[in-house]
């Protein structure tokens, strides 16, 4: 309904329960205006308290989207925040800017910053009594303990793992325009996570922009930039469940300009789907002509992905030709084996992401079944979830808890010691009541609650859980925390775990790829580790690695393409320490990627922390 329909007065304005409901109320022009002005208004009110997103948007709406008038009005009614004294942290320096993993709710077509009710339902005793926070808390040194606390309701972890549904996170890779977002949008639609009404809306919006075939892709690509360019820019994660397993999709960009985003997505996934465009000459442009297919697979192998599904997409464009299927497989398989994948860990599935055949609901025709007798994509994913979940069956109370911080969620509450952090369990398990330490700030916190996100039908459910285990994506509600010194890329660990280092120099077991120039001492590059990127340089070339995987006595002056060596790396322009683990301590967290001049030049494992 248009704004003019309510122009007679504020009394005619409906009551909105949340920000999403208000966004749906706006017409397209109003929504675009709001997206243009709202971020500026929000940024200019960061020093004020007592507002939320909905109240700011309503104020903008009432002032006809006039930023200056809205600011003047709000500053008269809002109170300024008290400026806390900066705590003395274990880690020095200012925050390093990193890109966030965008967690997008598929059940809503317009993103918002609402928090699940459970995250903000509790206040401290002082808040309930109207007392102000005690500033003395923020001037103390961070509290670090090595004595674990007990869970509120202890669970037998081994029994929990055996009874829980398998969980699988997978990243979707492939050359630009291979159909990655369309494929994942079709899968979510077939699973009834997106309903027919929402799909019709996306159909209208895509037709307006002359991109009617993008309706499924727009389920995943929700920003204006992504829709206008027709490529995925950010990393979108979506959660869904079947009766057999739980899943997290990471839809990574395929365009060369956004390879760093793809690296961040790969680092969080258990396995990968490679989406291949089987149309005439399309595979060749992504594979032979310096496309992203090879680079994505090289990154996946380098970052510890061992299991692949090759989604042979757009098979309807070649009339489901077995010859075309086998032709592509014969070119791609030798390359995958050459870079480290085992043939037994690769599944090949013919599909059409747009029509849905071979994805989930729409069965293969009799003609296709004459030459392909394997499962569809969804069944292949479920089988992979069971296979990979067996690796977690050995989890017990003695495995160290390790957690990658992917997002820090702002809280509406004024409690100084509350932090809400989302991320992935890389090892072990965690239960409410247990304590953890966050690195590099080395602050010890108590886990108050654990939340998992799931989507059923048309709604998003945020549920509490008593246990989170390796592989789970969860939000932790922490007490006794300093959220201002927690960042994306930080690591949390059991309080009695002492293997995380904050160092400037370390040794890599490095493998180089195709490079324009050799690596020499002093060569600068960008180091990617997890969701962090950091300028670094070659400090020292130590030795080549021979075929027996041992250090060679041959003198090393420079490192060329496709060579292996032990190399000492030095981080430069360090604004904030990066928590480090060796690959021996954790195989996934100890892996890094090196990029220079827009190209991936090498990858490696941290073998030793030197200083």
Swiss-Prot record:
Domain tr-type G: 165-390
Transmembrane segments: none
Chain segments carrying region G2: 230-234
Compartments reported by the entry: Cytoplasm
Documented effect of changing residue 517 to E: Abolished ability to trigger the No-Go Decay (NGD) pathway, without affecting the ability to promote degradation of non-functional rRNAs
Domain of life: Eukaryota
Modified residues (Phosphoserine): 124
Record's keyword annotation contains Phosphoprotein: yes
Sequence positions that bind GTP: 174-181, 313-316, 352-354
Residues covered by region (Disordered): 1-21, 105-138
GO CC annotation: cytoplasm; cytosol; Dom34-Hbs1 complex
GO biological process: nonfunctional rRNA decay; nuclear-transcribed mRNA catabolic process, no-go decay; positive regulation of translation; positive regulation of translational initiation; rescue of stalled ribosome; ribosome disassembly; translation
SUPFAM superfamilies the record matches: EF-Tu/eEF-1alpha/eIF2-gamma C-terminal domain, P-loop containing nucleoside triphosphate hydrolases, Translation proteins
Catalysed transformations (reactions): GTP + H2O = GDP + phosphate + H(+)
Keywords on record: Cytoplasm, Elongation factor, GTP-binding, Hydrolase, Nucleotide-binding, Phosphoprotein, Protein biosynthesis, Translation regulation
EC identifiers of the protein: 3.6.5.-
Main localization category: cytoplasm
Region annotated G4, chain positions: 313-316
Outcome reported for the amino acid change (mutating residue 520 to R): Abolished ability to trigger the No-Go Decay (NGD) pathway, without affecting the ability to promote degradation of non-functional rRNAs
G3: annotated segments: 251-254
Its job: GTPase component of the Dom34-Hbs1 complex, a complex that recognizes stalled ribosomes and triggers the No-Go Decay (NGD) pathway. The Dom34-Hbs1 complex recognizes ribosomes stalled at the 3' end of an mRNA and engages stalled ribosomes by destabilizing mRNA in the mRNA channel. Following ribosome-binding, the Pelota-HBS1L complex promotes the disassembly of stalled ribosomes, followed by degradation of damaged mRNAs as part of the NGD pathway. The Dom34-Hbs1 complex is also involved in non-functional rRNA decay.
Family assignment from sequence similarity: Belongs to the TRAFAC class translation factor GTPase superfamily. Classic translation factor GTPase family.
Subunit structure: Component of the Dom34-Hbs1 complex, also named Pelota-HBS1L complex, composed of DOM34 and HBS1.
Something else known: Present with 2750 molecules/cell in log phase SD medium.
This protein's name: Elongation factor 1 alpha-like protein
Gene name tied to this protein: HBS1
């Amino acid at each position: 309904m248009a704004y003019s329909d309510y122009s007679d007065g504020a009394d005619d304005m409906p009551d909105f329960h949340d920000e999403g409901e208000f966004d749906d109320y706006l017409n397209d022009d109003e929504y675009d205006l709001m997206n243009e002005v709202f971020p500026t208004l929000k940024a200019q009110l960061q020093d004020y308290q007592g507002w939320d997103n909905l109240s700011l948007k309503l104020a903008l709406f009432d002032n006809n989207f006039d930023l200056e008038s809205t600011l003047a009005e709000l500053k008269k009614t809002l109170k300024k925040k008290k400026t806390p004294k900066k705590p003395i942290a274990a880690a020095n320096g200012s925050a390093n800017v990193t890109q966030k993993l965008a967690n997008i709710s598929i059940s809503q077509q317009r993103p918002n910053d609402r928090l699940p009710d459970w995250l903000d339902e509790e206040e401290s005793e002082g808040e309930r009594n109207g007392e102000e926070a005690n500033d003395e808390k923020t001037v103390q040194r961070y509290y670090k303990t090595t004595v674990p606390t007990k869970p509120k309701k202890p669970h037998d972890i081994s029994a929990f793992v055996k009874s829980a549904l398998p969980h699988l996170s997978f990243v979707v890779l492939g050359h630009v325009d291979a159909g990655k977002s369309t494929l994942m949008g079709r899968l979510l639609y077939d699973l009834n996570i997106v309903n027919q009404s929402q799909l019709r809306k996306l159909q209208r919006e895509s037709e307006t922009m002359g991109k009617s075939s993008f309706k499924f892709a727009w389920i995943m690509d929700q920003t204006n930039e992504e829709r206008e360019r027709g490529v995925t820019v950010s990393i979108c994660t979506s959660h869904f469940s079947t009766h057999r397993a739980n899943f997290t999709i990471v839809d990574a960009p395929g365009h060369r300009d956004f390879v760093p985003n793809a690296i961040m997505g790969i680092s969080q996934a258990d396995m990968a789907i490679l989406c291949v465009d089987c149309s005439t000459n399309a595979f060749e442009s992504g594979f032979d002509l310096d496309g992203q297919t090879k680079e994505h697979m090289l990154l996946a192998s380098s970052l510890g992905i061992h299991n692949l599904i090759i989604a042979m997409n757009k098979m309807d464009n070649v009339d489901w030709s077995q010859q075309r299927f086998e032709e592509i497989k014969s070119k791609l398989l030798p390359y995958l084996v050459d870079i480290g994948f085992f043939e037994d860990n690769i599944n090949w599935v013919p599909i059409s992401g747009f029509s849905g055949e071979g994805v989930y609901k729409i069965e293969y025709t009799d003609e296709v079944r004459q030459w392909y007798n394997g499962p569809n994509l969804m069944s292949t994913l479920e089988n992979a979830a069971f296979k990979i979940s067996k690796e977690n069956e050995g989890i017990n109370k003695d495995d160290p808890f390790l957690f990658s911080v992917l997002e820090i969620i702002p809280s509406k509450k004024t409690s100084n010691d509350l932090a809400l952090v989302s991320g992935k369990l890389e090892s072990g398990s965690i239960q409410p009541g247990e304590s953890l330490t966050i690195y590099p700030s080395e602050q010890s916190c108590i886990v108050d609650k654990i939340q998992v996100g799931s989507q059923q039908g048309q709604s998003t459910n945020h549920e509490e859980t008593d246990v989170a285990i390796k592989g789970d994506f969860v939000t932790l509600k922490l007490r006794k925390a300093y959220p201002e010194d927690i960042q994306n890329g930080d690591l949390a660990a059991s309080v009695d775990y002492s293997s995380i280092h904050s160092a400037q120099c370390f040794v890599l077991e490095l493998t180089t790829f195709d490079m324009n120039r050799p690596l020499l001492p002093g060569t600068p590059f960008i180091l990617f580790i997890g969701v962090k990127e950091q300028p670094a340089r070659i400090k020292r070339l130590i030795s080549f690695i021979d075929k027996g995987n041992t250090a060679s006595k041959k003198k090393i002056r420079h490192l060329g393409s496709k060579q292996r060596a032990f190399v000492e790396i030095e981080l430069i322009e360090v604004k904030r320490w990066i928590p480090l683990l060796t690959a021996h301590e954790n195989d996934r967290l100890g892996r890094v990627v090196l990029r220079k001049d827009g190209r991936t030049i090498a990858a490696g494992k941290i073998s030793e922390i030197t200083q």
